[in-house]
Amino acid sequence: DLIIGNPPYFGMRKSDVESKYYDYFEGRPNIFVLFIILSLEKLNSDGIMSFILPKNFLNCLYYNKMREYIAENYSILVIDECSDDFIETKQETIMFIIQNTAPLNGKNTKYILQQNGYTIFGLEQNISEIKTMYTNSTTLKRMNFTVNVGNVVWNQCKDILTCSKDETLLIYSSDIKDNKLQIKKYNNEEKKNYIKKDGNTGPLLVLNRGYGKGEYKFEYCLIEGGFSYLIENHLICIKYNDEVSDEDLIGLYENIINSLEDERTKKFISLYFGNNAINTTELCNILPIYSTDLNN
């Protein structure tokens, strides 16, 4: 049999979805995933399903379980880009065709990347290039770093914000300019630069994601420490999990910065993420780090 579809694309409340489907997605479900699940349930042996899907189905980590299930149980026949976007959401789209037959002899590998426990789909040419770009690289996870957003939400702790320089410096995303820490004075009188709370004093690499001239770029700052500070939640923090001297840690961070500036990284981001934002999980587990000094 043949199932052809162009399912709708919108988020749903998890409580509106039967619990038996929770194993196929993480977080808030999107209705197109349910269309895939229900269609696969009805697909006969050797039957084919052909769907137009949002392009982020290929690598969004929320859909990793769905991709794992497909990779293990179905043969991928076609993954190709479509010229039309979803009209209402402006989402880029793909043609996704699979067959209800076991994937034999590595047939699916040309469309699949396995990385740090995640299953990623892609166009054949893109997957081939991405696999090549992982050569002689590592990841922040393998280097024993964790990646998270800052843990201070300034407008939820206004009562302990202060202008006193005797307190802990609160670093906002707008304090990072030209990859340097440049403390800004805010017009909003409630948004103050210091906080009455214990802070960190060691080195830390923070990222402020943004776009410049049509291409994705990292805005980063290496905070060398020596003073008390905390990070507001619009910045991403890259934290090392081992005990090393500040000097050695700064060296590790400088190697990461060199990798972020590497032309291979820029090409990888273009191939893998396109115009989509990079979240903390992807930064930690997916983005290759190229400096040979960091390979374990």
Positions of the model-derived regions?
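Signature of N6-adenine DNA methyltransferases within the class I
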Residues: D1-N151
